[in-house]
């Protein structure tokens, strides 16, 4: 049984930055360090940081006064920032810069009084944070998840309207929604550059190429990871069996029956150590040759805050 690895896979620049912020804060300051929401959607990463002294909370009222708190990679609403400032909490912001770009789009629309449509998944923390950038009662912000939502959408002024997107959606699905938006609202403004992040696009392209060569695809990632779920969907659309797994322990031997080629990829929040463990398990189950697809080289780096760029000397 051949094992093929997708390329690129795993951590993106935004995830690297977010984890590094928590990691360095734990090294520099005395724990506990509070993190609002899971810093990234991966159980392995969260458990590792928790063991080192990170305390994950959902709301700031769980954080003691004068504590250090880190905002997750998904971003937060303006009301959360205001509360943190009011309570004199020391903040480190791990919001992905590409999410911040979408926040700025929505903020500009709010200041102009232009209504905004956000394409995203209800309840996802990135969506909650992005919706929370809009605060102009003269306008409005609306969440849509599918072309069907657009049919029943009513806005105040279709001539002053823009749209933005959650960064981790399927590129193809977003294209269909945008097409429907432009058909209903011909004057709608869109971002100058697609909101779907480079890493999401690259990993979706890579998993499609992987699925075309595979009899089975395993996507390493947690079930609450939007981008990991999209990878599993993309592989399935090619016509192969595809499963989302948290770790090698989730692999079922019956999946491998009559499989000659198994493809492996990982969501943007899944560490490479989990991929290596999956490969090791597959080898025990009959895997032999391990190869890696050619893919896009990613060399983007997002810097951590200046206060955390301190070299530790033992």
From Swiss-Prot:
Assigned protein family: Belongs to the IspH family.
PANTHER family: 4-HYDROXY-3-METHYLBUT-2-ENYL DIPHOSPHATE REDUCTASE (PTHR30426:SF0)
Its job: Catalyzes the conversion of 1-hydroxy-2-methyl-2-(E)-butenyl 4-diphosphate (HMBPP) into a mixture of isopentenyl diphosphate (IPP) and dimethylallyl diphosphate (DMAPP). Acts in the terminal step of the DOXP/MEP pathway for isoprenoid precursor biosynthesis.
Binding site for isopentenyl diphosphate: 41, 74, 124, 225-227, 269
Descriptive protein name: 4-hydroxy-3-methylbut-2-enyl diphosphate reductase
GO molecular function annotations of the record: 4 iron, 4 sulfur cluster binding; 4-hydroxy-3-methylbut-2-enyl diphosphate reductase activity; metal ion binding
Domain of life (superkingdom): Bacteria
Organism: Psychromonas ingrahamii (strain DSM 17664 / CCUG 51855 / 37)
Pathway assigned in UniProt: Isoprenoid biosynthesis; dimethylallyl diphosphate biosynthesis; dimethylallyl diphosphate from (2E)-4-hydroxy-3-methylbutenyl diphosphate: step 1/1; Isoprenoid biosynthesis; isopentenyl diphosphate biosynthesis via DXP pathway; isopentenyl diphosphate from 1-deoxy-D-xylulose 5-phosphate: step 6/6
